[in-house]
């Protein structure tokens, strides 16, 4: 999806690839168009009047940026793929808000050349939310995980100077487990700082 920063072209160094079970692709078009629906008066009116969504809920949708929307769509795709139902749960994160993407919102609106209305909202909603499918997903085998892990070699070892030994350590779950206590200590330090 239309993300900005290191994650848009690289496998992040802090991603436990060997513990990843699925890769789910979300198109820029889906995140951009849903962002437009969630952040325009026409889109909000459509959601309230045509989809009967609570106005208070709709007023909170701008809290979802591109990555948050993509994570929600990926969760829907995974739920469909895994045949999950109302007795199951998927937990995801909303990592950003729409306020980070106002220039992108204006570009998306401009792409519709003044033809953006409730009919377009209905088409986009149906295509990108109601019509979410399980295409462009990969359930990872061990070899797939190794292949994705190795994609990071060029970025981190050759370009960023991470030692091969440090890079390779990340293949072992013990590496990630050893960082858990450190992460908890950081959480405590952050809490202490915030209470100052």
Region annotations inferred by a language model:
Residues 75, 101-104:
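A short acidic (Asp/Glu
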Residues 1-63, 104-196:
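Active-site/ligand-binding loops adjacent to catalytic centers
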Residues 63-71:
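Phosphate/oxyanion-binding active-site loops and adjacent basic polyanion-contact surfaces
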Residues 26-30, 70, 94-99:
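Glycine-rich beta-alpha junction loops
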Residues 71-79:
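Buried hydrophobic packing segments
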Residues 80-87:
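Non-catalytic interaction/regulatory modules that flank or connect domains
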């Amino acid at each position: 999806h239309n993300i900005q920063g290191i994650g848009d072209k690289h496998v992040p160094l802090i991603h436990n690839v060997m513990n990843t079970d699925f890769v789910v692709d979300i198109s820029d078009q889906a995140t951009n168009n849903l962002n437009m629906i969630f952040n325009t008066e026409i889109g909000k009116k459509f959601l309230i009047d045509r989809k009967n969504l609570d106005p208070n809920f709709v007023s909170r949708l701008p809290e979802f940026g591109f990555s948050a929307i993509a994570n929600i769509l990926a969760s829907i795709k995974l739920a469909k793929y895994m045949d999950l139902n109302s007795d199951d749960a998927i937990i995801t994160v909303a990592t950003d808000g729409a306020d980070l993407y106002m220039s992108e919102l204006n570009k998306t609106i401009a792409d519709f050349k003044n033809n953006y209305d409730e009919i377009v909202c209905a088409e986009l909603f149906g295509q990108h939310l109601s019509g979410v499918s399980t295409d462009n997903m990969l359930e990872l085998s061990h070899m797939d995980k190794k292949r994705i892990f190795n994609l990071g070699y060029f970025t981190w070892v050759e370009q960023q100077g991470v030692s091969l030994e440090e890079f390779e350590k990340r293949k072992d779950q013990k590496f990630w487990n050893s960082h858990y206590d450190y992460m908890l200590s950081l959480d405590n330090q952050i809490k202490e700082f915030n209470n100052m």
